[in-house]
Design a protein with these regions (language model features):
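N-terminal Sec/SRP start-transfer signal
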Residues: 1-6
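Alpha-helical transmembrane segments
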Residues: 9-38
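Residue-level signal for transmembrane alpha-helical positions in Major Facilitator Superfamily
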Residues: 12-16, 59, 112
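Mid-to-C-terminal secondary-structure elements
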Residues: 58, 64-215
Length: 215
């Protein structure tokens, strides 16, 4: 899934009833957690012959570079799931220094989203604490993550979430730990009428770099 931000874009939607038009207007008035003005999206699926994570990421990076060169395009980025259209899920996650006193011993996170560089900025998702991903993170030895407000307030209530470790649960204990570097504003992932849930953002560029050095 790719997102492009344009400086000037005219979108014309023809509807057949005033009620539908009013419904669309009302939905757009809801704060979804990101800036929906001037965004155009499309999906891309690479053929099976595209080899491994490294090959796929390089294709995406090349595509984004070319999109950014188009006149009128201010930025372009990519992610694995589009906000407002991502299904609610449940990913077991080890969360260090978890302050909750109830619930399962291994909490479940609703959304894991792998994003390309510049995703939060392109989408207009504010960082409420800490920082966003930086270009230097791609070559950093330590894996980093950005989480949303709901996750931080749920599992690190009363504590500073910045610097806290978490990782996807695995039975073989081989999943890497990610250090939280930033808290992003809540984004409605499953629809404007749904709660934001708990969410983790991981940087695709960093996953690609880790994969390259492990070979």
């Amino acid at each position: 899934m790719f997102v492009i931000t344009e400086t000037a874009l005219a979108v014309i939607v023809v509807v057949g009833a005033g009620l539908l038009l009013q419904t669309v207007h009302n939905l757009k008035a809801v704060d979804a957690g990101f800036d929906r003005s001037r965004l155009q999206t499309f999906s891309i699926t690479l053929p099976p012959r595209t080899s491994g994570l490294l090959g796929r990421v390089r294709v995406y990076q090349t595509l984004l570079e070319r999109l950014r060169e188009i006149p009128g395009v201010r930025n372009a980025t990519g992610m694995t799931g589009l906000p407002l259209e991502s299904p609610l899920s449940s990913y077991q996650t080890e969360i260090a220094n978890n302050t909750t006193t109830s619930g399962p011993p291994i909490p479940s996170i609703n959304y894991y989203q792998r994003v390309m560089s510049g995703f939060l900025e392109t989408m207009g998702i504010p960082i409420m604490q800490g920082r966003s991903f930086q270009s230097t993170d791609a070559v950093s030895a330590g894996m980093v993550a950005v989480v949303n407000e709901t996750l931080a307030n749920t599992y690190w209530k009363g504590r500073n979430p910045i610097g806290q470790p978490l990782r996807p649960f695995s039975t073989d204990n081989r999943s890497p730990w990610f250090t939280v570097i930033g808290i992003a504003k809540d984004v409605k992932q499953s629809g404007v009428d749904q709660p934001p849930g708990t969410q983790v953002y991981l940087l695709v560029d960093q996953l690609e770099s880790a994969s390259r050095h492990s070979q």
